[in-house]
């Protein structure tokens, strides 16, 4: 059974395995730089360890592959009979991280 972990990042919980690429909210790191996720909620595999609320001493290490922005989401507001129109676009930034190790 392969080892996996559930980490908290960007206000979300993400299940990760070694070698997996994940997309998370933007991190302040450049491409090629290593990042460590210390907020580990669960480590699973042979012996599953559930944190209360976090697993003590556990961490997940990954490498930033790239920074980017998601596809544009367009919002359009319209008020009838008032001649009021408003169009706004938003592109959420993200970071692509490849998981290298799960330290339990």
Curated annotation (Swiss-Prot):
GO MF annotations in UniProt: rRNA binding; structural constituent of ribosome
Keyword Transcription regulation: no
PROSITE patterns: RIBOSOMAL_L21 (PS01169)
Domain of life: Bacteria
GO cellular component, one term: ribonucleoprotein complex
Pfam families: Ribosomal_L21p (PF00829)
Keyword Ribonucleoprotein recorded: yes
Keywords, sorted A to Z: Ribonucleoprotein, Ribosomal protein, RNA-binding, rRNA-binding
GO biological process, one term: translation
Family in the record: Belongs to the bacterial ribosomal protein bL21 family.
Record function comment: This protein binds to 23S rRNA in the presence of protein L20.
Binding partners and assembly: Part of the 50S ribosomal subunit. Contacts protein L20.
PANTHER family membership: 50S RIBOSOMAL PROTEIN L21, LARGE RIBOSOMAL SUBUNIT PROTEIN BL21M
Protein name, UniProt field: Large ribosomal subunit protein bL21
Gene source species: Streptococcus sanguinis (strain SK36)
């Amino acid at each position: 059974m392969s080892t996996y972990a559930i980490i908290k990042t960007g206000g979300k919980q993400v299940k990760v395995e070694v070698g997996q690429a994940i997309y998370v909210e933007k991190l302040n790191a450049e491409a090629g730089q290593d990042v460590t996720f210390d907020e580990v909620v669960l480590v699973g595999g042979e012996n599953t360890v559930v944190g209360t609320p976090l697993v003590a001493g556990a961490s997940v290490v990954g490498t930033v592959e790239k920074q980017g922005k998601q596809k544009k989401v367009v919002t359009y507001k319209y008020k009838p009979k008032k001649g009021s129109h408003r169009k706004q676009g938003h592109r959420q930034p993200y970071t692509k991280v490849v998981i290298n190790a799960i330290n339990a």
